[in-house]
Curated annotation (Swiss-Prot):
It holds the Pfam family SfsA_N. This is Sugar fermentation stimulation protein homolog. HAMAP family: SfsA. Transmembrane segments: none annotated. Coiled coil: none annotated. It comes from the Bacteria. Signal peptide: none annotated. The gene is sfsA. CDD domains: SfsA-like_bacterial. Belongs to the SfsA family. It comes from Pseudoalteromonas translucida (strain TAC 125). One of its GO terms (molecular function) is DNA binding.
Length: 238
């Protein structure tokens, strides 16, 4: 996914009210940007971090700028716009960059499925293969105890919605389909992914149950720059 035009730089002053972030330009001027992230953003939005933002051409937007990337104290870029995860995954699937999800004939998004009124991120279909249901999760939580370890976690906060998605994936396997939970790693410092049992033990237990029942878990890391993001490196899920 290319940023067109390339992102502009600023300094993050604070992130607040979930959807807002105050930024400061090099000339000292300040403005408020939209922050498309409902999570805690632990370790991703500290005051003083370098920040990179896009500007919308939609004149009706109250906040034309959007916070896209931050850069932590270890100079690692982090994509904090959660909408990007699905975009880069779709591009990677279409470009056959994810071998486990390659060679399907059709890719659909936001398809209703399951018994809990969910929508799957992606449904892959082919005439001679089982349907493949793909749920995407954005991973940006780096271990705070040992940030040099490369250990990433999901979720960064307790998530009933995430638990529901796992139950739905288990149901798809029981119906004879493929079900894949794909962790899109959008943090340069993360080199492996685990379920965050210390944050949401129920989620970790459900995920372990899902794996035992045949749900596939993949983790792919994005190559991040202020010009583009490409999902291409497979990481271990442990």
């Amino acid at each position: 996914m290319k940023y067109q035009p390339a992102l502009q730089s600023a300094t993050l002053l604070k992130r607040y009210k979930r959807f807002l972030a105050d930024l400061q330009l090099s000339d000292g001027s300040e403005f408020t940007a939209h922050c498309a992230n409902t999570g805690k953003m632990t370790g991703c939005a500290e005051p003083g971090f370098n920040a990179f933002y896009s500007t919308s051409t939609n004149s009706k937007r109250k906040y034309p700028q959007s916070l896209e990337l931050t850069q932590n104290s270890l100079s690692q870029l982090i994509c904090v716009n959660t909408a990007v995860a699905n975009k880069v995954v779709a591009e990677a699937i279409n470009a056959n960059l994810i071998s486990e999800l390659s060679n399907y004939e059709q890719l659909q998004s936001e398809v209703k499925y399951g018994n809990e009124n969910s929508r799957i991120d992606f449904l892959l279909t082919s005439d001679e293969r089982p349907n493949c249901y793909v749920e995407v999760k954005s991973v940006t939580l780096l271990s705070q105890d040992n940030p040099h370890s490369g250990q990433g976690y999901f979720p960064d906060a307790p998530t009933l919605r995430g638990q529901k998605h796992i139950r739905e994936l288990i149901e798809m396997v029981e119906q004879g389909h493929r079900a894949v939970l794909l962790f899109a790693v959008l943090h340069q410092g993360i080199n492996q992914v685990s379920a965050a049992a210390h944050i949401d033990n129920k989620y970790a237990q459900l995920l372990n149950e899902a794996i035992n029942q045949g749900v596939e878990v993949l983790a792919y890391k994005a190559d991040i720059s202020t010009n583009e993001i490409i999902l291409k490196e497979k990481l271990p899920f442990i």
